Swiss-Prot record:
PROSITE patterns: BPTI_KUNITZ_1, BPTI_KUNITZ_2. It comes from Bungarus candidus. This is Kunitz-type serine protease inhibitor A. GO terms for cellular component: extracellular space. Residues 1-24 form the signal peptide. Coiled coil: none annotated. Residues 31-81 form the BPTI/Kunitz inhibitor domain.
Length: 83
């Protein structure tokens, strides 16, 4: 296979992996914990995964502490936790 063909195959596999939803059995356990704003007062826009609604929701993060169900973008939250 030519290098162009290999590059195309690699690109298609990468795209497929990005578009494949995360199943609940593969979802990290921290995606199921409620959001924790932390103990500081920085008022940072963040996102957490809500397993009941099965989507990522915006919340205000204090900037320190908290838990792992805390993402800088909705996209990062979806890639990690959403089905």
């Amino acid at each position: 296979m030519s290098s162009g063909g290999l590059l195309l195959l690699l690109g298609l596999l990468t795209l497929c992996a990005e578009l494949t939803p995360v199943s609940s059995k593969d979802r990290p356990k921290f995606c199921n914990v409620p959001p924790e704003p932390g103990r500081c007062n920085a008022n940072v826009r963040a996102f957490y995964y809500n397993p009941r609604l099965r989507k990522c929701i915006e919340f205000t993060y204090g900037g320190c502490g908290g838990n792992a169900n805390n993402f800088k973008s909705r996209g990062e939250c979806k890639r990690t936790c959403a089905e």
